[in-house]
Structure formats: C-alpha cells, structure tokens
C-alpha cells in the first residue's frame, strides 16, 4: 500500500510585480495556511517519509510551513520538473518515489488535473475540481511499488482546503 499527499502550494504574494513567477514567496495568508495544513496532517497521522517538491519559492515555503508540525524529518527532494508540470510529468516523478507515504507539492493547473486523473472517484468536496491554493488530497494506492501506480487507481481518503481547517 502506498499513500500520496498531494498539495498545491499555499497562497503566494503578488506584491512585487517585478518578482519572477518562480521566485514569488508566500503571503501572510499562505504562511498561516501552510502551518494549519501541517497541524491537520499531523493530527490525522498523514506523515510523509519523502517530499517531492517543485523548486519554486512558494512550494518550498509551503513545505517549510508544514514541516514543523510533522513528527520526524521527511526527506525533501526539490524537483525542478514539478514547476508548472502537467499530469504526465507529475506521474513520472511520482513513479521514482521511495517512501511508502509521499507528499508532492506543486502548482495549478497541473496539480488539479493530476489529482482528478489519479483517483477512481473524486472526493465529494466541491473544491476538488478547482484545487485552490493549499488544497490537499490524500490518496491510497494498492501497489507495492510507486512504479506500478496508474491513473484512475487511487482511492481518495481525504481532501481539505485551508479555510476548512481555520474556519
């Protein structure tokens, strides 16, 4: 059994229009949301052993906000290929994962498309199709190796958006 925690980066800042997209940090709401997500993940024992993260600033800072709440220290792997990746690239990266529980942190629109294609049946949450900032899907796969994961084979275990935690 393998478990994927699929998280879109938290809310980023657009304060400086000259900041390149890749370098945009989180805004205050995003920082708070990342911390809330960390608490939510830890409270449900959704703890990754490995984190596959886009190398953009906002995805790295999302993980930095989540990490303090997690027991242990998951291995963080920055993956430039995940920056604005589509579902096929995301799947290729996932198939090289090693831990039983993996977190992937990426960007829309690719992450929403990837989530939709991964699970056999989408969660009932109306935000799933939109996959807003901080949205997190937890999905299980009945495989022994990540290399065997296929689109449509995941079972949605949980789905949350940050405002549902804080609100």
What does each of the following model-derived ranges do?
Residues 4, 99-106:
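Generic beta-sheet signal
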Residues 85, 148-167:
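Functional cleft and adjacent loop/helix regions within the main domain
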Residues 103, 113-127:
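Flexible, glycine-rich active-site loops centered on histidine and acidic residues
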Residues 44-46, 96-100:
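Glycine-rich phosphate-binding loop signature in dinucleotide/nucleotide-binding domains
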Residues 122-157:
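Domain-level recognition of soluble alpha/beta enzyme cores
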Residues 81-94:
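Short alpha-helix plus adjacent loop in nuclease-associated cores
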Residues 2-81, 123, 131-132, 167:
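Active-site-proximal alpha-helix that buttresses catalytic centers in soluble enzyme cores
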